[in-house]
Amino acid sequence: MLCLPVFIILLLLASPAAPKSFETKVQSDLTRTDGNMETEENLGEVRKVYCCLGVRDDWCCAGQIQI
């Protein structure tokens, strides 16, 4: 008699309609944030830092490549 309510509760917890756990929500938020950071503006800034500060390439800093 007690097994049926326990089984139903476990079934509800394992169902896809159950709310997401905290870790899953954080992981999806971080994934969404990473996707939003890869805009052309942000990638252009990374290219500028790499070319002008990291490599010190005059050709790159002079704007010969499209940033």
Curated annotation (Swiss-Prot):
User: What keywords is this UniProt entry annotated with?
Assistant: Cleavage on pair of basic residues, Disulfide bond, Secreted, Signal, Toxin
One example of the protein's molecular function in GO is: toxin activity
After translation, the protein is modified as follows: Contains 2 disulfide bonds that can be either 'C1-C3, C2-C4' or 'C1-C4, C2-C3', since these disulfide connectivities have been observed for conotoxins with cysteine framework V (for examples, see AC P0DQQ7 and AC P81755).
On the tree of life, the source organism's domain of life is Eukaryota
Q: What is its main location?
A: secreted
Residues cleaved off as propeptide: 20-46
- Signal peptide, first to last residue: 1-19
Query: Where in the cell?
Result: Secreted
**Notes on the domains:** The cysteine framework is V (CC-CC).
Tissue distribution: Expressed by the venom duct.
User: What protein family does this chain belong to?
Assistant: Belongs to the conotoxin T superfamily.
Q: Pfam families given for it? A: Chi-conotoxin
Output this protein's name: Conotoxin Lt5.9
List the record's Gene Ontology CC terms alphabetically: extracellular region
InterPro entries of this UniProt entry? T-conotoxin
